[in-house]
Design a protein with these regions (language model features):
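Conserved ABC transporter NBD signature motif
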Residues: 61-76
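Catalytic Walker B motif of ABC-type/P-loop ATPase nucleotide-binding domains
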Residues: 155-159
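Conserved ABC ATPase "signature" region
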Residues: 98, 102-105, 109-126
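Conserved ABC ATPase signature
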Residues: 130-137
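Helical segment within the ABC ATPase nucleotide-binding domain
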Residues: 169-182
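ABC ATPase "signature
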Residues: 214-215
């Protein structure tokens, strides 16, 4: 990417007692780029996301946005959509956006943008649907609409494909490609290299909380000398 990094992570570290969950992790994400955080279960992906979003305090490292180090309260800069997206069960899709508008003191006229976002994300017909009646895919979209309405520049999605049927996965891919054109910095976590290959401009591979490799899929393939995606992943994460 030609643009300067929007999000920069340097030396991120997090422990739980004697267990090292993330150890000296560094990577960057540019505006309009999708980066995949790839690794087996227990690699430290979710811990990294929780630390980036401010839900966990790392013991080491810095997180910067546009060259400025972020403090612990960074919810207006980095939004996390967890593996199991949670919405308010008794609020409608539209009421979620009303809540965002009020809590962020958005300027008058936000309703037009909110309506356009719902249509863009395929939620136009779900405007009055209660949160408890939404599928996982619809909950994801509701949270994404909220982050876009608040104009949060960095979007983290933890294992976003899990639990989605093939149509839902296809819709999510199309939505992420569309979001990339808006200049958002997007990071997804996954343990499946095929998904990372399909979705991501670059891939950052972790194992046991440590950085293993990073690059485009083609760069990683050339480095390892493996054509098959699964063989490539196994080779890079081999003990």
């Amino acid at each position: 990417m030609d643009s300067a990094p929007l999000l920069q992570i340097d030396g991120l570290g997090k422990r739980f007692g004697a267990k090292v969950a993330v150890d000296g992790l560094s990577f960057s994400v540019a505006a309009g780029e999708i980066v995949g955080l790839l690794g087996p279960n227990g690699a430290g992906k979710s811990t990294t996301f929780l630390a980036l979003a401010g839900f966990l305090r790392p013991e080491a490292g810095t997180i910067s946005w546009n060259g400025v180090a972020l403090g612990h309260d960074r919810g207006r800069t980095i939004a996390l959509i967890p593996e199991t997206p949670e919405v308010y069960p008794l609020l409608t899709v539209w009421e979620h956006l009303v809540f965002v508008a009020k809590s962020n003191a958005l300027a008058p006229g936000w309703e037009k943008k909110a309506g356009e976002l719902l249509e863009r994300l395929g939620l136009g017909g779900e405007r009055d649907t209660l949160g408890r009646a939404l599928s996982k895919g619809m909950r994801q979209k509701t949270l994404i609409a909220a982050t876009l309405l608040a104009d949060t520049p960095v979007l983290l999605l933890d294992e976003p494909m899990i639990g989605l049927d093939p149509q839902g996965q296809r819709e999510l891919r199309e939505m992420l490609f569309d979001l990339r054109t808006t200049g958002k910095a997007i990071v997804i976590s996954t343990h499946m290299i095929e998904q990372a290959q399909q979705l991501c401009d670059r891939i950052v591979i972790l194992k046991d909380g440590r950085f293993v490799a990073a690059g485009t899929f083609d760069e990683l393939r050339e480095r390892v000398g493996r054509e098959d995606a699964e063989e490539l992943f196994l080779e890079l994460t081999r003990a």
